[in-house]
Amino acid sequence: LLLGWAWIDPKAAVSGGPVITGLFANFLIVVIFFLQGWRLRPARMFEVWADGYTLWITQIAIIATPVALVLSGWAVGVISEEKLSPFLLLACLPTTISSCVVYARGAGGDGDYALGHATLSNLLAPFLVPLAWFFLIRPSGPAHFPMTSALMEVVPNMLLLVGLPCFFGWWFRKAVTPKPKPLAEWLAGNLPLVGIALLAYFSLGQALILHGREQCRAEAVELLLPLGGGFLLLSFFSWFLSGLIRRDRGGRVATFFCLSQKSLALGIPMVHLLVGSNDAELFKWVFPVILLHVIQLVGGALIMLLLRR
């Protein structure tokens, strides 16, 4: 609904001006990561350490597999030079906690095992994604700053807007609400979706003002084939790799969804932090995340139904 409203009236999304919009976007990021920290289960996460081989192979494959696919697509000309950096950033995102756990359980897999790997992946993301940004992606051009200055700006932002909110969310859950009511659980699970939708709303509204509807529509058409085909290839390789990592069906299904799903909850906030909320190029980084999220939600649900049979 918010994206539809941004398409109809994009001026409303930027009516507060760049300063107010940027401050509100940072506030939303803090709330999102506070709630992500509130939902983390460190005790369950540590259970995946029982098998160090599967632990590290899975965590490496979560990033290495999509990165290899993106680079292969670029090498054969499916992904253009202009789209390479946004696609690499997308490939380096962690697995999503919510959908991979839901799909794993729905397909008869080990949902708790998926939760452990997804939790660890999301904890590592605030460190790995900025490293990938500077050492793998490193976009060039006047809109971006030198690496030393970027590190001095992005690392504090990651600590203040990601690390501390996650820690305080985890601490608040442990110290204040160790046994939350169902309503609190529901709010913690759904409020981040509202925050993500608002961030996407601001990004789309800003893009429509800067680039116009026709260019945005053309962007969607251009991205649909590489993202849709990329999701199918990632799913194929994820199923193959999951069979090598785990022999039992429950573990294999859980590993498959961990490898094949990317996090919108971390993706959009991290794009805002790395690119900058007022960057004229923000849309080209955010839109692939949004479009892939829709593709993987629909595709993941269909795969879940197939695996359930």
What residues fall within each predicted segment?
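Alpha-helical transmembrane segments of multi-pass small-molecule/ion transporters
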Residues: 1-309
